[in-house]
């Protein structure tokens, strides 16, 4: 038994099973929280993670109800059995329950305080909004507790808490307990009315909230004091009670948790401190909580699991990992991964949808809230320790734990309690072992009772049942208090005392995992309906549908139906109430308590006792048609029966497709009854079976039964003509030649080729993408099988299925002159075997699926240790899609169940290929050219700059409920229309273009819905948004457009974009729409007898997100009540807050479009309440916006709709800039719009508004970004570029050669580069210019960096470049003549420095070497900064020593890794260089070979995470001597020797004397390639070649330039007259919006010019000199970008201001000096000072600096350009992640002005670094810098100095 002694080890203490959350909640705010607590959970414990979760939960409820019926039927039989309760039964029951666990009379917050004393600096809370150590948590909670005491909080008081997920919740929770009060956690996402009811029941006079929820707190607790807690709360001293905190009795109330109540209001469960602690401590021992536990905090605060998540973790000394609300609900796997949590608890449904790497990364996975299947348990326990548990809220959080799931998947044994099973009708009667009974819980975990409900408490909290006081045999009777759970359970057969859950005995049900009293649902519905309506809520399982909560209604005045039907139409009064019930009911209860449908009956069925016959209602529910579940009632027009033969056949087909037996009338609408595009496709097939011919277009254009029947044609049911093998070959390519050609490409025999036909455009695109990224579009699926025999059976089924399905045997090859072709191969399948799933998956990912290889493969993995056999299938998306995969699985299942009886399909994939080949390409070209002619070029979201490569990195979700749909309009049409309206306001245009990915199965091919193969396709959708059009007209136009594009939807984006310049622009799709129609039926539960079912992903919509190539992908999953939208987006293009508002607008617009077809689009309100709030904030600060300063006399600036200023523009959307000023302007005037007047504060100016003619938008911070002139930007540009001219293509040979080089360097397609495009506008800078020059040399082209800056466009640059061969595209000869990096002769650079090289080597160099056996191959002098960094390596502080931490997430071959490290050293001479000293000068000695140290460390302390442990090793290492003559390179490897597959870390130590930020990424890539065996490391240029070139060529050639530039100059000093008493660093920073800058000026020039201007103004000088950090590589050396060594330099920049200069003049001057000095930047400052006769040595040094002043600048400006700053974080070859550590801080020598580019070049961070003593001076300097930069950006034409 675990004690609670005061021990330093911080071992296991308090525990609970904490849920991890859900990845795909339909309605995020009401999503339930999973826990390790079974179906009897009091306050909801399964999660609405996805459809699967809902199905399983509902199925469990249904089973519970069936069990109740069985109990009634077997009552007599069981009564007889109970009377036969044997002595043996009693012996066994009392043996299990003889000892009641001890009551632990302690408070959990006291235990946490003890932990804080033991581990003050350990992190207690790691949250999205910051972290807290135990010391900080203890201090803050104590301060807040004292403040609460002052406000009257005391023992006996209950304090509600209202917080979003935050670190401050934990602080508040502890503070309330320390103050002596009880807390009651609430979830702010629940309805306000419900929260108010909860608070009222607590009688609270004070409420504690977060700052964000303070306004909500005031609403739900009117009259109460609201204390908002945030960082600001503690920034100033809190008023506190002078009395000490009380000693809180353990018997006092700790918390109240609210659950569903049968009276219509939530009921509060009261738990004492000793209740909680007595359960928490034994749970800790059972589960394994430790001080190293990192517990993921998912649960909603409305559920008591969240209490355990915080308090039990802290009581163990562990770490609470708090995700953001968005991360918790929208990116579960990513949040768990980012938090590095090692303990997660959830429902099985949620665990199934986690990314594959999550579960293996955990130490503990807790499952509960749902029945855990044997297959789930078998799957997950092979990766982690699996726990199952259960517990109702009335007995704290959990009271059973099963920690041995290999024996059983039940809910386990009691912890902190004992458990009895009694007769459900009489708790004084025990039931025999093995029989079903009601579970009673006895022990200290049994709570106080229900708040304010003594009668209810007495009913279920009982005392002294007769069998307990009587005892048995040697077991003495006892008094006891027990809780009646209402859960039906039984003891398992293994006689271990473990318990199996069976069901419920009452009307309590589980909905989306929540415990719900049906009577509470009924109560709230009743309040929303007219009087006289009988209401019964039930969970039903309709035919072919998921378990669903519905409400049955019966009116007293109902007259019944004339045909005797059970169902009747509601009265007008009831109908009106039902039309708005979702809204009225949603204001009262959480969304999971709102029924999916309201079914009106002629009368409510009753039993003989006149009680409602719920069994009968459930039977009725089975027959309820699907159409009744999507709406409260339907309007189908006149109910005329089908008359013609076609109508009758079609009606039958409708019923089949809609899975409904409801009558279909002539006027019925297919879409009105639940049809959609998916079902339309299926209807084509169903109609064909009836002998009727239809197309999808026919169905959309003729949605009513009569119209559709009239359109149909009579056809034969015979299948279409079979496509013969090789009949689809291109002309001139015969079968024999084709077989030979493709067989050679596949590496097979010609006779093994069964067929060949072309690829689809989709397949071409997918193969092209995966050729660039090895793992792109490849999926792995794992199926865990029960035994090897099952595996063999599944293998045989797969083999048989592949014989019947050509797509499973298809490969893709690139045939010269014929393109990509698919080859059907007829050969025996091969498979792989293994013994470890994780190892195989890693190995399999390394095996590419290339052209000519198999694109489906499988393996059988037998893991004897885990006792499992797994079937692993790997497949390429070029051969399957989300539609075809279930068809493949169906074929495998057929072979599995009925071997030798193959499944027959009407068509194969080649039938679809034949259809594509038969299409008239000219017609498709004509269609798309017309569709996209004149399309608006601006798309949402906007590119930050031309050439930007999008990458989605964020995910948001929103559920959009739809109460109704316009007749004959589909949800898909509504979604397209709504998004078009939203997007239009963000681009300031009514012409909207976005992409849509379609199923592609609208093609008129027989059996198209059964074709096994990928048919998805993406098209550009152009939607004109006409404000004068009615909603109905708008929807109809979009629907007609989508139908009209069906014949052309497979033309392919890559082909559409080539049709015209407009088409090319339109196909630059930024946003993509993916629609997932609702399925016909509920997805079946996984059938254990059909293991292939596990190959289908549970969430098809979420699967689509893995293949997102858009900047914004909207995946919409439709259901009968609305649709769920998941937005995956690039946060650099659209920030998260803007995207969140856009989704709110999307939801609002969709709902408005659904409500009325006669509303004008111009009257559809696109802005949400959040938009209004955001605008209110920006309007309130409009007078302070920097843009105001750019207009003389302006008092404020706003953004208005450019087409209609009476309407608001949301934050992030484009509009026209309007200024407010009292000075008349020569601009268009504008009355103050009413919306603006309403938002303006009383103090706002009332001056007139003037339209400036400039387009602008509010950025994420609420500041105005000016995009440019309206005239030049409208309809022609992105926000980041000047007006785009028609692109002129390259025509000459030299232009095309240069364009190819641009494309490679800038990573921009050649088709996007025109003659008039500027290299720098497309993303180029000085570094990429240098790379271009280097790349051009092997191609026979000579270009200098200076030429590039002077001739920026492709046409200009091509005209000045020199070509060695202009007559041929071949560049072999030119390449042969291209210069290579010169290799210096050994020791030649010592000429002039030493008299005798041999003597110098023997007497100076070798004696200093650490190892006398080393052979020196060269010695060369060090460069200036290299020498400084050597000295900063050999002496303390060693600020030049860098530790690169490389974390491996999987198993590592240590021998291979060690060899790779040594090979990297051998590959780069700079790494095998050691340093020696002579005559105060440092020399570099290059060794022939060097075995660098490689030390191994055992990571055996799990109390410290790997990163911290490794960094401690590094800090110890840096203190060791690193003398001259020794290797600065060293390797440290940290791993757990007992867990070779666990995470490990390699540390690469080096000195800054050996690298700079340009060559280090190259070295890391080389290391990765060396470890991968099969890759040749990319070459690098030796540093000696660079030094030789610089010293022999660059320095002599450059000194005259510097001498002339700097003649008569002095280094500008900038030193406050303030003593330096504190030499610590002070860094002050501010972000500046530069989006309106002149784009032809590089990002490097702007901050340099800014500093020059600021320095000139501050010092009142017109001639300033300061230092810049440059790459040092612009030296004309071939391959300079690949030099392995430290080339960076400090160089001077001199600006002599002309009094007449404007900002444009300064920017041009600085850029020109950059161009001119680029070729001279290798010269060091020391060389300039010593050789140019500048007289700088007379200047004073910086205070405390003993070096010559001429060797250093007083101020340095550093542009941290993006591609130098950034490098890849993840190494795909070794699955690694990088982290950098500098152990020692660099002493400050000068003022530093640093800039960091952000937001794709639209903003920069300006940072000033100086001494702490000068910090205040630095703040003033930064303000001046910001002012100067804003002038250069916004007013570049303004003079710099007044006359």
From Swiss-Prot:
- Cofactors: pantetheine 4'-phosphate
Q: What happens when the gene is disrupted?
A: Leads to increased sensitivity to oxidative stress and iron-starvation, reduced conidial germination as well as reduced virulence. Impairs the production of the 6 siderophores beauverichelin A, dimerumic acid (DA), Na-dimethyl coprogen (NADC), fusarinine A, fusarinine C (FsC), rhodotorulic acid (RA) and tenellin; but increases the production of mevalonolactone and eleutherazine B.
Q: GO molecular-function annotation terms?
A: ligase activity; phosphopantetheine binding
UniProt keyword annotations, A-Z = Ligase, Phosphopantetheine, Phosphoprotein, Repeat, Virulence
Per the record, residues carrying O-(pantetheine 4'-phosphoryl)serine are 677, 1326
Instruction: Tell me the route in metabolism or biology where this protein functions.
Output: Siderophore biosynthesis
One family from Pfam that matches here is: Condensation
Region of interest called Disordered, as start-end residue ranges on this chain? 1-83, 628-647
Annotated region (Adenylation 1) at 133-528
The record's GO CC annotations read: cytoplasm
Q: Example GO biological process term?
A: secondary metabolite biosynthetic process
Known function: Nonribosomal peptide synthetase; part of the gene cluster that mediates the biosynthesis of at least 11 siderophores, including beauverichelin A, dimerumic acid (DA), Na-dimethyl coprogen (NADC), eleutherazine B, ferricrocin (FC), fusarinine A, fusarinine C (FsC), metachelin A, mevalonolactone, rhodotorulic acid (RA) and tenellin. This cocktail of siderophores for iron metabolism is essential for virulence, and more specifically for the fungal virulence in penetrating through the host cuticle. Siderophore synthesis is also involved in conidial germination under iron-deficient conditions.
Domain text from the record? NRP synthetases are composed of discrete domains (adenylation (A), thiolation (T) or peptidyl carrier protein (PCP) and condensation (C) domains) which when grouped together are referred to as a single module. Each module is responsible for the recognition (via the A domain) and incorporation of a single amino acid into the growing peptide product. Thus, an NRP synthetase is generally composed of one or more modules and can terminate in a thioesterase domain (TE) that releases the newly synthesized peptide from the enzyme.
Q: Which PANTHER family match?
A: FATTY ACID SYNTHASE, NONRIBOSOMAL PEPTIDE SYNTHETASE
What protein am I looking at? Nonribosomal peptide synthetase SIDD
Organism (species)? Beauveria bassiana (strain ARSEF 2860) (White muscardine disease fungus)
Its gene is SIDDA
């Amino acid at each position: 038994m675990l004690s609670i002694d005061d021990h330093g080890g911080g071992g296991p203490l308090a525990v609970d099973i904490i849920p991890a959350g859900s990845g795909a909640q339909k309605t995020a705010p009401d999503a339930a929280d999973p826990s390790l607590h079974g179906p009897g959970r009091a306050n909801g414990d399964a999660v609405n993670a996805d459809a699967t979760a809902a199905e399983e939960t509902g199925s469990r409820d249904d089973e519970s109800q069936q069990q109740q019926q069985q109990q009634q039927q077997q009552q007599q039989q069981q009564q007889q059995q109970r009377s036969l309760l044997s002595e043996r039964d009693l012996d066994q029951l009392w043996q299990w329950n003889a000892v009641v666990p001890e009551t632990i009379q302690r408070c959990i917050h006291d235990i946490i305080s003890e932990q804080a004393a033991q581990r003050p600096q350990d992190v207690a809370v790691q949250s999205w909004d910051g972290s807290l150590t135990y010391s900080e948590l203890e201090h803050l909670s104590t301060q807040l507790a004292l403040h609460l005491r002052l406000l009257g909080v005391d023992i006996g008081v209950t304090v509600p808490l209202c917080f979003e997920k935050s670190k401050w919740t934990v602080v508040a929770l502890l503070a309330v307990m320390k103050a002596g009060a009880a807390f009651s956690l609430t979830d702010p996402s629940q309805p306000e009315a419900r929260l108010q009811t909860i608070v009222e029941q607590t009688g609270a006079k004070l409420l504690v909230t977060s700052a964000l929820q303070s306004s909500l707190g005031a609403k739900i607790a009117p009259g109460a004091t609201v204390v908002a807690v945030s960082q600001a709360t503690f920034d100033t001293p809190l008023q506190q009670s002078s009395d000490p905190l009380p000693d809180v009795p353990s018997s006092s109330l700790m918390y109240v948790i609210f659950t569903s109540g049968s009276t219509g209001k939530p009921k509060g469960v009261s738990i004492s401190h000793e209740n909680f602690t007595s359960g928490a401590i034994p749970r800790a021992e059972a589960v394994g909580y430790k001080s190293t536990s990192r517990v993921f905090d998912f649960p909603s605060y409305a559920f008591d699991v969240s209490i355990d998540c915080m308090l039990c973790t802290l009581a163990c000394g562990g770490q609470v990992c708090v995700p953001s609300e968005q991360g918790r609900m929208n990116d579960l796997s990513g949040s768990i991964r980012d938090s590095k949590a090692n303990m997660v608890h959830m429902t099985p449904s949620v665990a199934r949808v986690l990314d594959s790497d999550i579960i293996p990364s955990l130490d503990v996975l807790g499952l509960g809230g749902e029945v855990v299947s044997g297959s789930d348990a078998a799957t997950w326990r092979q990766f982690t320790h699996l726990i199952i548990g259960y517990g109702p809220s009335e007995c704290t959080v959990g009271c059973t734990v099963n920690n041995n799931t290999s024996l059983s998947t039940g809910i386990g044994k009691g912890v902190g309690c004992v458990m009895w099973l009694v007769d459900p009708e009489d708790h004084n009667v025990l039931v025999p072992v093995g029989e079903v009974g009601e579970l009673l819980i006895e022990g200290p975990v049994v709570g106080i009772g229900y708040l304010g409900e003594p009668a209810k408490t007495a009913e279920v909290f009982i005392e002294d049942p007769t069998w307990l006081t009587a005892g048995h045999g040697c077991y003495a009777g006892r008094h006891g208090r027990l809780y009646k759970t209402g859960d039906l359970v039984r003891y398992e057969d293994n006689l271990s005392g473990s318990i199996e859950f069976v069901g419920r005995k009452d009307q309590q049900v589980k909905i989306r995992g929540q415990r719900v009293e049906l009577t509470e649902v009924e109560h709230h519905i009743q309040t929303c309906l007219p009087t006289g309506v009988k209401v019964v809520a039930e969970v039903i399982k309709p035919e072919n549908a998921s378990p669903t909560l519905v409400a049955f209604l019966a009116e007293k005045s109902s007259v019944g139906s004339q045909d005797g039907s059970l169902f009747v139409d509601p009265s007008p009064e009831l109908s009106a109430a039902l039309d708005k019930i979702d809204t009225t009911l949603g204001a009262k209860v959480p969304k999971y308590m709102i029924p999916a449908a309201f079914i009106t009956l002629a009368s409510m069925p009753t039993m003989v006792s006149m009680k409602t016959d719920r069994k009968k209602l459930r039977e009725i529910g089975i027959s309820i048609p699907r159409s009744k579940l999507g709406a409260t009632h339907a309007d189908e027009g006149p109910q005329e029966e089908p008359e013609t033969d076609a109508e009758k056949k079609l009606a039958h087909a409708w019923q089949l497709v809609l899975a409904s037996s409801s009558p279909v009338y002539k006027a019925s609408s297919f879409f009105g009854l639940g049809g959609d595009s998916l079902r339309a496709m299926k209807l084509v097939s169903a109609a064909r079976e009836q002998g009727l011919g239809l197309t999808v277009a026919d169905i959309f254009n003729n949605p009513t039964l009569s119209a559709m029947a009239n359109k149909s044609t009579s056809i034969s049911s015979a299948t279409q003509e079979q496509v013969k093998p090789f009949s689809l070959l291109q002309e001139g390519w015969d079968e024999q030649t084709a077989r030979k050609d493709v067989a050679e490409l596949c590496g097979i025999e010609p006779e093994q080729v069964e067929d060949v036909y072309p690829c689809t455009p989709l397949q071409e695109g997918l193969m092209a993408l995966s050729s660039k990224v090895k793992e792109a579009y490849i999926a792995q699926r794992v199926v865990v099988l029960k035994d090897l025999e099952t595996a063999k059976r599944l293998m045989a089924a797969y083999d048989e299925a592949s014989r019947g399905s050509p797509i499973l045997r298809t490969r893709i090859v690139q045939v010269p002159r014929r393109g990509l072709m698919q080859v059907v191969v007829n050969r025996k399948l091969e498979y792989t075997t293994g013994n470890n799933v994780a190892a195989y998956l890693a190995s399999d990912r390394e095996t590419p699926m290339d052209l000519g290889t198999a694109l489906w493969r499988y393996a059988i993995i037998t893991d004897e240790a885990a006792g499992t056999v797994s079937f692993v299938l790997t497949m390429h998306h070029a051969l399957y899609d989300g539609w075809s995969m279930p068809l493949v699985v169906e074929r495998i299942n057929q072979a599995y169940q009925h071997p030798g009886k193959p499944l027959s399909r009407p068509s194969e994939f080649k039938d679809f290929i034949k259809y594509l080949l038969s299409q008239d390409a000219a017609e498709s070209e004509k269609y798309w050219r017309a569709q996209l002619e004149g399309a608006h070029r601006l798309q949402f979201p906007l590119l930050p700059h031309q050439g930007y490569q999008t990458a989605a990195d964020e995910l948001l979700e929103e559920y959009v409920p739809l109460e109704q749909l316009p007749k004959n309009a589909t949800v898909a049409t509504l979604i397209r229309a709504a998004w078009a309206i939203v997007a239009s306001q963000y681009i300031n245009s009514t012409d909207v273009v976005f992409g849509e990915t379609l199923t592609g199965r609208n093609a008129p091919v027989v059996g198209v819905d059964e074709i096994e193969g990928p048919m998805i396709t993406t098209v550009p959708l152009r939607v004109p948004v006409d404000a004068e059009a009615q909603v109905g007209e708008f929807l109809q136009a979009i629907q007609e457009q989508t139908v009209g594009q069906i014949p052309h939807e497979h033309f392919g984006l890559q082909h559409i974009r080539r049709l015209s310049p407009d088409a090319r622009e339109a196909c630059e799709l930024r946003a993509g729409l993916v629609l997932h129609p609702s399925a016909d039926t509920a997805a079946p539960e996984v059938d254990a007898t059909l293991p292939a079912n596990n190959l289908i992903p549970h969430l098809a919509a979420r699967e689509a997100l893995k293949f997102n190539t858009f900047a914004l992908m909207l995946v919409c999953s439709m259901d009968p009540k609305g649709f769920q939208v998941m937005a995956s987006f690039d946060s650099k293009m659209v920030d998260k807050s803007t995207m969140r508002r856009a989704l709110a607008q999307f939801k609002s617009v969709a709902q408005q479009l659904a409500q009325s077809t006669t509303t004008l689009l111009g009257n559809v309100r696109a802005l949400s309440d959040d938009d209004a709030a955001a605008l209110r904030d920006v309007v309130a600060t409009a007078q302070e916006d920097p843009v105001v300063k750019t207009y003389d006399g302006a008092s404020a600036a706003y953004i208005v709709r450019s087409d209609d200023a009476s309407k608001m523009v949301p934050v992030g959307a484009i509009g026209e800039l309007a200024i407010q000023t009292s000075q008349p302007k020569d601009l268009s005037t504008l009355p103050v719009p009413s919306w603006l007047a309403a938002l303006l504060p009383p103090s706002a100016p009332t001056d007139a508004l003037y339209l400036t003619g400039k387009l602008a938008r509010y950025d994420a911070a609420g500041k105005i970004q000016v995009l440019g002139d309206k005239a030049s930007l409208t309809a022609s540009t992105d926000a980041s570029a000047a007006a785009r001219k028609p692109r002129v293509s390259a025509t000459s040979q030299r232009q095309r050669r240069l364009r190819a080089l641009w494309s490679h360097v800038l990573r921009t397609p050649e088709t996007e580069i025109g003659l008039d495009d500027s290299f720098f506008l497309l993303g180029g800078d000085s570094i990429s210019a240098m790379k271009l020059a280097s790349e051009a040399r092997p191609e026979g082209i000579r270009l200098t960096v200076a030429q590039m800056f002077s001739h920026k466009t492709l046409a200009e640059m091509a005209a000045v470049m020199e070509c060695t061969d202009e007559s041929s595209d071949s560049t072999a000869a030119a390449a042969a003549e291209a210069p290579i990096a010169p290799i210096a002769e050994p020791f030649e650079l010592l000429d002039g420095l030493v008299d005798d090289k041999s003597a110098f080597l023997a007497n100076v160099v070798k004696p200093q070497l650490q190892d006398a056996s080393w052979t020196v191959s060269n010695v060369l002098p060090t460069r200036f900064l290299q020498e400084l960094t050597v000295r900063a390596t050999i002496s303390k502080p060693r600020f030049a020593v860098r530790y690169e931490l490389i974390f491996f997430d999987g198993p590592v071959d240590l021998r291979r890794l060690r060899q790779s490290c040594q090979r990297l050293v051998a590959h780069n001479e700079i790494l095998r260089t050691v340093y020696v000293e002579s005559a105060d000068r440092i020399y570099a000695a290059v060794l022939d070979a060097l075995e660098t140290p490689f030390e191994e460390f055992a990571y055996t302390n799990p109390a410290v995470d790997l990163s911290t442990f490794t960094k401690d090793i590094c800090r110890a290492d840096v203190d060791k001597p690193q003398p001259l003559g020794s290797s600065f390179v060293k390797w440290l490897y940290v791993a757990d020797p007992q867990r070779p597959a666990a995470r490990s870390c390699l540390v690469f130590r080096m000195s800054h004397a050996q690298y700079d930020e340009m060559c280090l990424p190259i070295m890391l890539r080389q290391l990765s390639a060396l470890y991968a065996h099969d890759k040749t490391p990319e070459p690098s240029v030796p540093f000696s070649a660079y030094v030789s070139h610089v010293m022999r060529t660059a320095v002599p050639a450059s000194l005259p330039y510097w001498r002339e530039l700097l003649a008569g100059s002095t280094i500008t000093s900038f030193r406050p007259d303030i003593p330096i008493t504190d030499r610590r660093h002070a860094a002050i920073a501010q972000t500046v919006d530069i989006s309106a800058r002149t784009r032809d000026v590089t990002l490097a020039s702007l901050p340099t010019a800014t500093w020059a201007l600021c320095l000139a103004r501050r010092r009142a000088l017109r001639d300033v000199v300061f230092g810049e950090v440059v790459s040092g590589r612009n030296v004309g050396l071939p391959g300079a970008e690949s030099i392995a060594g430290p080339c960076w330099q400090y160089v001077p920049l001199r600006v002599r201001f002309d009094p007449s200069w404007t900002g444009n003049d300064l920017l041009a001057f600085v850029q020109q000096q950059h161009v001119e000095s680029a070729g001279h930047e290798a010269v060091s400052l020391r060389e300039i000072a010593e050789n140019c006769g500048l007289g700088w040595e007379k200047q004073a040094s910086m205070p405390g600096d003993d070096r010559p002043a001429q060797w250093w600048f007083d101020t340095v400006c550093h542009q941290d350009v993006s591609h130098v700053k950034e490098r890849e974080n993840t190494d795909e070859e070794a699955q690694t992640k990088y982290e950098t550590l500098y152990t020692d801080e660099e002493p400050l020598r000068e003022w530093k002005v640093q800039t960091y580019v952000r937001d794709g070049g639209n903003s920069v961070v300006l940072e000033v670094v100086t001494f702490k003593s000068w910090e205040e001076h630095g703040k003033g300097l930064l303000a001046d810098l910001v002012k100067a930069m804003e002038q250069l950006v916004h007013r570049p034409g303004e003079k710099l100095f007044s006359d």
